[in-house]
Amino acid sequence: MERAIFAGGCFWCMVQPFEEQAGILSVRSGYTGGHLPNPSYEQVCAKTTGHTEAVEIIFDPEEISYKELVELYWAQTDPTDAFGQFEDRGDNYRPVIYYTTERQKEIAEQSKANLQASGRFDQPIVTTIEPAEPFYLAEDYHQGFYKKNPKRYAQSSAIRHQFLEENWS
């Protein structure tokens, strides 16, 4: 089993696309990249801890490759927006691919270069690629949010879904 960590704005919106893939064992919402151990949602939202909202994915590389996960990640984000994603603004929503191995770093960097060269976007690809740091699990009510609160999830992700349909379909 391998581990991948992606930050792409609100973690509620990052779970379902990965959970639906074969070879995914778990997708958990949490916080990473900051300086405070075990932060709360309120602390992260106050933008004082340096953390991003992220998802931790445990996957079977025999069924789905890290490269495939990175490609799926891009299709959930606006990789030209360094200051948040869609409705969610601020450093805690910045797009980041956190790598856990040097091989993951190489794959992510090549994928980013390929996306930039593709001409899909007029703006530079600004998603950062950073070494993984401790991942702190978010509170229970955030886990599987799209299943527990489908109406609120739909409302909170409307702008994202419109962008994804226009730019990735």
Swiss-Prot record:
Domain of life of the organism encoding this protein: Bacteria
SUPFAM superfamilies according to UniProt: Peptide methionine sulfoxide reductase
Record-given protein name: Peptide methionine sulfoxide reductase MsrA
Catalytic residues in the record: C10
Annotated GO MF terms: L-methionine:thioredoxin-disulfide S-oxidoreductase activity; peptide-methionine (S)-S-oxide reductase activity
GO terms of biological process kind: protein modification process
InterPro entries on file: Met_Sox_Rdtase_MsrA_dom, Met_Sox_Rdtase_MsrA_sf
Record EC number: 1.8.4.11
Catalytic activities: L-methionyl-[protein] + [thioredoxin]-disulfide + H2O = L-methionyl-(S)-S-oxide-[protein] + [thioredoxin]-dithiol; [thioredoxin]-disulfide + L-methionine + H2O = L-methionine (S)-S-oxide + [thioredoxin]-dithiol
Gene label: msrA
Keywords annotated in UniProt: Oxidoreductase
Organism of provenance: Streptococcus pyogenes serotype M5 (strain Manfredo)
Record carries keyword Oxidoreductase: yes
Family: Belongs to the MsrA Met sulfoxide reductase family.
